[in-house]
From Swiss-Prot:
PANTHER family: DELTA-1-PYRROLINE-5-CARBOXYLATE SYNTHASE (PTHR11063:SF8), GLUTAMATE SEMIALDEHYDE DEHYDROGENASE (PTHR11063). The keyword Cytoplasm applies. The gene is proA. It is found in: Cytoplasm. One of its GO terms (cellular component) is cytoplasm. InterPro entries: Ald_DH/histidinol_DH, Ald_DH_C, Ald_DH_N, Aldehyde_DH_dom, G-glutamylP_reductase_CS, Glu-5-SA_DH, GPR_dom. Its main location: cytoplasm. The keyword Oxidoreductase applies. This is Gamma-glutamyl phosphate reductase. Pathway: Amino-acid biosynthesis; L-proline biosynthesis; L-glutamate 5-semialdehyde from L-glutamate: step 2/2. PROSITE patterns: PROA (PS01223). Catalyzes the NADPH-dependent reduction of L-glutamate 5-phosphate into L-glutamate 5-semialdehyde and phosphate. The product spontaneously undergoes cyclization to form 1-pyrroline-5-carboxylate. It comes from Geobacter sulfurreducens (strain ATCC 51573 / DSM 12127 / PCA).
Amino acid sequence: MSIAEKIRNIAADARQAAIAMAKLSASAKNELLLAMAGSLVRNTVQLIEENRKDLEAGEAKGLSTAMLDRLMLNEARIKAMADGLREVAALSDPVGEVTRMWTRPNGLRVGKMRIPLGVIGIIYEARPNVTADAAALCLKSGNSVILRGGSEAIHSNLAIARILGEELKRAGIPAAALSVVPFPEREGVLEMLKQEEFIDLIIPRGGESLIRFVVENSRIPVIKHYKGVCHVFVDADADFDMAEKIIVNGKVQRPGVCNALETLLVHKDIAETFIPRIAETLIELKVELRGDDCVRQFVPQATKATEDDWHAEYLELILAVRVVDDLDEAVAHINRYGSLHTEAIVTRDYHNAQRFIREVNSSTVLVNASTRFADGNQLGLGAEIGISTTKLHSFGPMGLEDLTTTKFIVYGDGQVRP
């Protein structure tokens, strides 16, 4: 059987399993996830053995130390995966929730009820923990899931899926509710992206090149975010101490994540006093500054910023800095160069804060808080499947609710249309 035929069979089986998943009660799904968590811990030795195969292959290929670290499973990381499953089990189940109900003049009662999407495909890179995390979220929201992880983690991913799949069987749920594409070749991804008959949604998790590849080759709707070009605007009346804390946290705490700060905008009225202060702090923290001409008047050691810098997601200790005339120019800059991810304003002016919230066209907008809060857990969603910077079907950090859709439900007592 060819790869194309095998992928089609996996997708068709997942579609059938989705019918069974949609019928499960919240308690049945929670019991399943708790059983899966326990099974991961019990099989720690087996998982580490399978993961060692990936690590040895990665070392032979010359993978970087950082990549090998992302790939590695140990006892603590397996326990963390299990804890993640337990946390998802503790979340409220969105399936079956009636979000609105109203009565028509003819007596019909109309409502909208949350239902699973169906079959979700997750395409990701060399992070075995995503196999368990993504599976938990999809299953809890009543969906089937097809996982295609990076080829570097093929042994780890298959082992995790096999362990979780055994618990599906014990619970009397079709094992096809959780599948892993077992082919490391790119052909496996391409064939998966053709299965629009069976797969309802694709969620890619990884770098910009992976996401663009998926978008360009998929026949299935894709939830995506290419990159996180996140901004902080320091308004004219901002509290300097607060602004400094927010900027340092956004840039320095974890510079390699998508909600890290990449561009700082400073109101011209405070540039002369605030920019030297924040520059001194950031330079002490080993941050490279790239500024416009005005910034470089106050910080001569800053590199001259180019047009590319305003578009850049650095993911390292580099920060682009620009002086703007007012709120209008700050908003215009963000809406031109931003990636619809996360933006923040530091201000004491309520009117300016409200304007910033309304006019900035991004999925998460903060007032007097760090961009690092653009995260499902931090925003109270529980676990997160990813962050979307497209407005269909979801926008911003995605939790369980975002893995559902709604259908209309209508109650009558014999009404017919005149």
